[in-house]
Regions:
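Broad structural signal for hydrophobic residues in well-ordered alpha-helices, predominantly aliphatic
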Residues: 22-23, 95, 233, 244
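A broad structural signal for alpha-helix termini and local helix breaks/kinks
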Residues: 26-27, 99, 237, 248
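Transmembrane helix irregularities
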Residues: 26-27, 71, 112, 181
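Hydrophobic alpha-helical segments and helix pairs
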Residues: 70-125
Length: 259
């Protein structure tokens, strides 16, 4: 059964990202894929819902928290994209410059890679999502509680940064949640995936739900999240950001250190 879902999800992601690539060509802005990213998970939820018409309470809650996370992220990223368009994210500009002879083909492949990666994150959740039970125990309640912390935390981290940037283009945001973590948005994004793991523990093969949370932890802290973001900020802010690094936790919100 999992193989059937894998096939459906990969095909769906491929089609969605092919449409996203067409939008990229029309808008001349590869950053549109960031807006599309949460829609991949929403479409995957649609597949589960469509193929399981009689969903249990456990399934409905699990699907809803994943849906709400990605709906919020979609709205936030769409607003951000509209605000900055036609300026393209430097990640994609730099990526295209690495392939001067075939930049569009390179972008197409990086889009499709994101579709595969989204499937890798979602597939381990499916056995738990297919668990048919109508009760929520202590573990599920704990998962929901952690999820609410993650949802609220990510919302405020994004809002605080957005509000700060609108008033202080040339300064460093180190107030609010950003006083306690250099990347609170990434931390709470990861906490979403932790909540899926906790909620799914008592589901079918619930231990598999740890795979996406560990994958996102590595991705955000070592590959596409903190690392490139801090390299850019060090170039832009120099000594100010070096001081921020010395006094403020990189990921987990902690009391600031004194120099």
């Amino acid at each position: 059964m999992i193989y059937n879902y894998l096939y459906l999800i990969l095909i769906t992601n491929f089609l969605i990202l092919t449409i996203a690539f067409s939008l990229n060509l029309k808008l001349k802005n590869a950053g549109i894929v960031d807006v599309i990213w949460p829609l991949l998970f929403i479409s995957n939820i649609g597949i589960i819902t469509k193929t399981n018409p009689n969903l249990s309470l456990y399934q409905l809650v699990f699907l809803f928290i994943i849906f709400l996370t990605n709906l919020r992220l979609f709205i936030y990223l769409l607003i951000r994209f509209i605000k900055h368009h036609p300026n393209e994210d430097t990640r994609y500009t730099n990526f295209k410059s690495s392939f001067p002879k075939f930049p569009n083909l390179a972008i197409f492949f990086i889009y499709q890679f994101q579709g595969i990666f989204a499937a890798i994150l979602f597939i381990p959740l499916i056995p738990a999502l297919l668990t048919n039970k109508n009760t929520l125990g202590t573990i599920e309640i704990l998962g929901i509680f952690i999820y609410l912390i993650a949802l609220i935390g990510e919302f405020y981290a994004d809002k605080q940064l957005s509000d700060f940037k609108s008033k202080n283009n040339d300064s460093l945001c180190n107030s609010g949640l950003w006083k306690y973590s250099r990347h609170p948005n990434y931390f709470f994004e990861w906490l979403n995936w932790v909540s899926y793991f906790i909620y799914g523990l008592n589901g079918n093969n619930g231990w598999l739900c740890i795979i996406p949370s560990l994958t996102m932890l590595i991705l955000l802290t070592k590959i596409t999240g903190i690392k490139p973001s801090e390299e850019l900020m060090l170039k832009k802010r120099g000594q100010i950001y070096e001081t921020y690094i010395k006094t403020t936790s990189a990921f987990i919100p902690l009391p600031p250190k004194s120099l």
